Amino acid sequence: MDGALMEGPLFLQSQRFGTKRWKKTWAVLYPASPHGVARLEFFDHKGSSSGGGRGGSRRLDCKMIRLAECVSVVPVTVESPPEPGASAFRLDTAQRSHLLAADAASSTAWVQILCRTAFPKGGWALAQTENPPKFSALEMLENSLYSPTWEGSQFWVTSQKTEASERCGLQGSYVLRVEAEKLTLLTLGAQSQILEPLLFWPYTLLRRYGRDKVMFSFEAGRRCPSGPGTFTFQTAQGNDIFQAVEAAIQQQKAQGKVGQGQDITRTDSHDGETEGKMAPTPVPQEPLGSPPALYAEPLDSLRIPPGPSQDSLYSDPLGSTPAGAGEGVQRKKPLYWDLYGHVQQQLLKTKLIDSKEDPIYDEPEGLAPAPLRGLYDLPQEPKDAWWCQARLKEEGYELPYNPATDDYAVPPPRSSKPTPAPKPQGLILPESGTTAGSGSKGSDTALYSQVQKSGTPGRWDCGLSRVGNDRVGVKSEGST
């Protein structure tokens, strides 16, 4: 098995059901070798992973950190340490952050050895404060009064998944620096292991910002380089970041007010000096009474002289004079006023002569009388045609009223069905006592000497008078 670089007790902070607590573990740091990668393992109790000790050591579930994924190892300050005199440090990976603690000496040693193992290219040896400073050839000493503006204002944060962070490609751990005028997000370089600026947000473009026990969040405006959106960072120092941002904003406000006052004072003094050195040059004014030249401007660009507001184009009927036109100051007539007036009078005379045309603006819109309806505007559909049979319908309540009789005009009575003419009756002949063929010639001659015709139409009589012995009869409709 690989030999351990360092091992010892470490307190690991865990969070369960919203409660943070410290758990004491036994940590073992393994370097990179042909048999394994560099890693930090945690066990329940002291013991060697090679089988030594009482029954060997049992590793905690999912408690192994690969140092190849380590992003940073920095000391931090916690409010409630696991025991008095303990110092904490945070180990950040691409997935999450681990908060560890040990006594002061062990914590410093753990940070040093972890940095050497995780970042072998950098010189991470901690400076010994007890040793005197080494002078170079130029004999340069460190200035104890010098400190960068962001010292104490850099915080390790872990980006949380939001719409804005996904758009900017933020994932993992970064350093958030609170500067005097902006928030800057730093990341470690791929080769130099130096913090390089990635994004920044000026305070004047932040819409709002806030903090929680485990995170710090702010909303950027649309004019920020990152674009609009909310950025959330997980950190245990959210309150410290919030206070630093608030102090920077208040300081920037105070500087802005002082700068505005200085600018105003400088502007006033500069204006006073300018007025004392040089007086304004008088602008030549044109004489008020000089009339405009006739052809100074084209006809289309003639301007109406300033005066009271004129009435609208169709506010009054044609030819009417607005009230108060002759009172007050007389208006100056335009250049071609006489010509326009003459043309308007000619048009008015033409309209008055033509009596067929109606005036255009005599009546207001919408108040003209409605035209009379024609005779056939409202046709009525005839009903009961099968009963009327094209005859005039005569009923008492629909006939015209007669005021003389206080009644409706009653139609004349209808004629009854026509009766046919009476049938003609046959001629009744007196009965003769003699038989036919008996008698003398004289009687027969007297009987049939005359033929009687009836004037009744439809009746026919045929009478013939013969002289002889033959008997001639008269036939009628009544005879058989």
UniProtKB/Swiss-Prot annotation:
- Compositionally biased spans, kind Low complexity: 253-262, 432-445
Where are stretches of biased composition, namely Polar residues?
A: 446-455
Q: Which gene is this protein's source? A: Dok1
**Which Pfam families does this chain map to?**
IRS, PH
Classification via Gene3D superfamilies: Pleckstrin-homology domain (PH domain)/Phosphotyrosine-binding domain (PTB)
| Keyword Protein transport listed | no
Q: Which domain of life is it from?
A: Eukaryota
Residue positions, PTM Phosphotyrosine? Y295, Y336, Y340, Y361, Y376, Y397, Y408, Y448
**Gene Ontology cellular-component annotations:** cytoplasm; nucleus
Boundaries of every IRS-type PTB domain copy: 151-259
User: What are the residue boundaries of the PH domain, all occurrences included?
Assistant: 3-119
* Basic and acidic residues: bias regions: 265-276
* Residues that bear N-acetylmethionine: M1
- Protein name stated in the entry: Docking protein 1
| Compartments it resides in | Cytoplasm; Nucleus
Q: Which SUPFAM superfamilies match?
A: PH domain-like
